[in-house]
C-alpha cells in the first residue's frame, strides 16, 4: 500500500485516539505521520465496537471476518506505533476498517434522522452529535434522498440527492449520478441544450433508512446541467433535478436551510463537517490474502445503501489534486463509499448548518473530494441553486 495513504490512515487513527484520550501521542518528528495510540488500546475499542454480530448475519462468517480484521489490524498498528510505514496490503486495508469501527471516522446509521445513542462509535463524537441535534440535524436529514431507478432499493440505486427548493421541487446531485442512471440502469433521457428530459423512470426516496419500511418517493422529470459540466475532476460535477409527486407521495420535507459560497469553507478556516448520504458496499479488495470487501460487508451487517451520517474534517484546499485544473474541488476525510456521491458537505456545528460543497468521490485513507460552492457559485446559481 502506498505510503501517502498509510500516512493519512495513521493521522486519522491518531485523531481518534486523541479524541478518546488527551494524553495520546501527537505528531511524529517532521509531521510525517501521527503516532496512534498503543495497539492494544485501539484494538480494545474495536473489539468493543464489534462485540456482537449484527442481525441477519451468519455468526460463523462474522467471527471469522472479525478475527481476520483483528489479526491484521494488530500487526499494522504495532508497525505504526514504532513509526514503520511499510504496511502490507492486508494490514493497510485493516487500518481502513479500523478507522470506521473505532470511532475515528465513523459512518452512523440514521433512524428518523437520529443516531442510535447505543452506537458503539458514538462516544468519540457525543459532544458534536448533541450540538448537531440541537441545531436540527434530523430535519436536515429528512431533505436527503436516495436516487434510484424503478423498483429501486438499498442495493439498486445510483447516488444521493438533497432537496434545495421545495416550492420549485429542486434537488441537487452530481452530474455523474445522472450519467450513471443512464449508463447502468438504462434510464432514457432526451437532451435539449443544457437540459435533460427524463423519459425513463428515475426517482428519489427521502426515507431510505435501515429501520424503516416507509418510502417517500418523488419522480425525477428534468435535469439542468451547469455550463462546463463533467464527471469528477473533468468538469463541474453537479446537476439540479426537478421532481414531481407520485399519486402516493406525501408532502415534501423542508429543504436544506442554506447553501453557502463563503470562502472560509474552501480554505479550511472552518474545518469540522459532516455529510448525509447513502454509501454503498465498499470495494476494499486490494488485500493480498483477504477479500476485505467481504470482511467489511459481514462485520457491518450489510447495512449499505441506507441513510448514514459521516463526520470528518477539511483536508485539502482548491487545486490540490493534480486533475483539478479548474481549482474547484476541496478535500475532506469523512468516511464515504460509492453511493454517497451527491451528498452535501455541511458545517454541521454552525448555526443554520450551511452546506458548502458537493461530494463526488475519493478514497478512504487518502482524501475524498467535493465541488466547492465558493468556486462555482455562478454556474450553480444559473441552474437554480440559491445562495
UniProtKB/Swiss-Prot annotation:
Q: What class of enzyme is it?
A: hydrolase
**Molecular function per GO:** serine-type peptidase activity
Record-listed E.C. numbers = 3.4.21.-
Query: Which Pfam families does the record associate with it?
Result: Trypsin_2
- Check the record and name the InterPro entries matching this protein: Peptidase_S1_PA, Peptidase_S1_PA_chymotrypsin
UniProt keyword annotations, A-Z: Antiviral defense, Hydrolase, Protease, Serine protease
Is Membrane set as a keyword in this record? no
Q: Which GO terms describe its biological process?
A: defense response to virus; proteolysis
- Gene3D superfamilies from the UniProt entry: Trypsin-like serine proteases (2.40.10.10)
| Family label | Belongs to the peptidase S1 family.
Say what the protein does. Possibly a dedicated protease for substrate gasdermin bGSDM; cleaves the bGSDM precursor, releasing the pore-forming moiety, which integrates into the membrane and triggers cell death. Involved in defense against bacteriophages. When this probable 4 gene operon (bGSDM-FE772_23060-FE772_23065-FE772_23070) is inserted into E.coli it provides nearly 100-fold protection against phages T5 and T6 and about 8-fold against phage T4. The operon without bGSDM no longer protects against phage.
- Protein name, as recorded: Probable serine protease FE772_23060
**What organism is listed for this UniProt entry?**
Lysobacter enzymogenes
Amino acid at each position: 500500500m502506498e505510503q501517502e495513504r498509510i500516512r493519512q490512515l495513521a493521522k486519522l487513527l491518531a485523531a481518534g485516539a486523541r479524541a478518546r484520550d488527551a494524553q495520546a501521542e501527537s505528531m511524529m518528528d517532521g509531521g510525517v505521520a501521527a503516532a496512534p495510540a498503543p495497539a492494544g488500546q485501539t484494538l480494545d475499542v474495536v473489539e468493543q465496537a464489534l462485540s456482537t454480530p449484527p442481525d441477519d448475519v451468519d455468526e460463523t462468517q462474522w467471527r471469522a471476518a472479525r478475527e481476520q480484521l483483528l489479526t491484521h489490524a494488530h500487526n499494522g498498528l504495532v508497525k505504526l506505533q514504532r513509526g514503520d510505514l511499510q504496511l502490507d496490503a492486508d494490514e493497510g486495508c485493516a487500518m481502513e476498517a479500523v478507522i470506521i469501527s473505532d470511532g475515528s471516522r465513523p459512518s452512523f446509521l440514521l433512524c428518523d434522522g437520529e443516531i442510535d445513542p447505543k452506537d458503539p462509535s458514538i462516544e468519540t463524537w457525543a459532544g458534536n452529535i448533541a450540538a448537531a441535534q440541537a441545531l436540527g440535524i434530523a430535519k436536515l436529514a429528512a431533505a436527503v434522498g436516495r436516487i434510484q431507478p424503478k423498483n429501486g432499493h438499498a442495493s439498486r440505486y445510483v447516488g444521493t440527492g438533497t432537496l434545495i427548493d421545495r416550492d420549485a421541487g429542486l434537488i441537487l446531485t452530481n452530474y455523474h449520478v445522472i450519467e450513471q442512471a443512464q449508463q447502468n440502469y438504462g434510464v432514457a433521457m432526451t437532451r435539449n441544450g443544457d437540459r435533460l428530459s427524463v423519459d425513463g423512470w428515475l426517482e428519489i426516496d427521502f426515507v431510505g433508512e435501515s429501520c424503516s419500511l416507509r418510502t417517500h418517493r418523488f419522480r425525477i422529470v428534468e435535469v439542468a446541467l451547469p455550463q462546463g459540466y463533467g464527471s469528477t475532476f473533468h468538469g463541474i460535477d453537479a446537476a439540479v433535478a426537478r421532481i414531481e409527486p407520485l399519486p402516493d407521495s406525501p408532502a415534501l420535507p423542508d429543504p436544506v436551510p442554506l447553501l453557502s459560497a463563503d470562502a472560509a469553507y474552501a480554505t479550511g478556516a472552518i474545518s469540522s463537517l459532516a455529510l448525509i448520504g447513502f454509501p454503498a458496499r465498499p470495494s476494499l479488495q486490494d488485500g493480498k490474502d483477504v477479500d476485505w470487501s467481504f470482511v467489511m460487508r459481514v462485520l457491518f451487517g450489510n447495512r449499505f445503501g441506507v441513510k448514514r451520517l459521516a463526520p470528518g474534517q477539511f483536508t485539502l484546499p482548491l487545486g490540490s489534486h493534480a486533475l483539478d485544473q479548474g481549482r474547484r474541488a476541496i478535500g475532506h476525510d469523512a468516511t464515504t463509499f460509492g453511493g454517497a456521491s451527491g451528498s452535501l458537505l455541511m458545517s454541521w456545528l454552525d448555526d443554520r448548518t450551511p452546506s458548502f460543497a458537493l461530494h463526488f468521490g475519493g478514497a478512504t485513507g487518502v482524501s475524498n473530494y467535493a465541488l466547492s460552492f465558493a468556486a462555482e457559485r455562478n454556474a450553480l446559481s444559473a441552474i437554480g441553486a440559491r445562495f
